[in-house]
Every structure is written in C-alpha cells, then in structure tokens.
Amino acid sequence: MEILDVYDIKGNKLDKTTVRGNLQLKEGEEFIKIVTVWFRSGIRYLIQLVSKQKGSEYAVTGGHVPTGSTSREQAKVECREELGFDLDDDKLKFIGSVVETRVIIDVYLYEDEDIDLEEVEFNLQEEEVESVVWLTKDEMEDMILKGILRDSTAHQYMVYIKDM
C-alpha cells in the first residue's frame, strides 16, 4: 500500500494523505504529485515503452511521489528502479509543473551531452519498462499525431520540451 501526500493546486502540501489506487480527493481542490524525467543527449530524448501490464504506451520515466519524499528525490528513485540509471544531481533540472486531473506532474530535464547513445546500457525493470528508444522532436511529434505517446507525456512535450 503506497501512501501519498495531498497538495493544493499550487503544489503546497496539505495536512492530508491518501492511498494510491483508492484516491480520496476533492475534485479540483486536492491533488497528488507525480514526477517525470526527460533525458536529453544532443537532439535526442529518451522515451520508454511501458510494459504490457502498465498499458504498452510510450512515455517518459516517472512515478508517484510517496509521502515524505520530494519530487526531486523520487525522480532519482524512478530512474534507478525503472532504468537502472543513477542520475548525476548536477545534471537534473526542474523545468516546471503540469496540472492535470487529480495530479500535479513535476517535470525534470536530465541533460547529458556525454551519453553515448550507442553505448549506454540500461537495466530495465521488466514489470515497468519493455524497451527504450532515443527520439528527435520530429519523431515525438509524429508519435503525438499518431496517438501513440501517452497523453500526459505529449502534454509535457508541448508545454516544456517542444520549444527548447
């Protein structure tokens, strides 16, 4: 059972928690936090194919922020768990938040020009991630048009990544 802190629309933590899978939130007033991490090396971004159990869709790395954790801390946890990749804190940059139905998504950019796209190896968590692919912005926009990029990932792309 995963316990999550509850936040107001501005991202301020309220004196309340809820249980993942059984969210008890006042619509439009209370939210949980999710974190996502966009990896960029040169002109390419890392997108993962989420496992079949999780919906078989393309998305960025991320997850729920549990009680007592910050989104920055959880960004590191999610990357370690899902990709087997330890983030260098100096290269992890908060770029903003997106508010969606019942969630506030804290969006981070991990930029590392030294990643060799042909050589980097990820140790994927099979329950979460089927595979990963490095894409250009044009390739992501094509996926958005085809409807094969998770809606929240497409939303983050349009708000923060497209014009970078």
Residue ranges and their predicted role:
Residues 1-36:
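Acidic, metal-coordinating catalytic segment for phosphate/diphosphate chemistry
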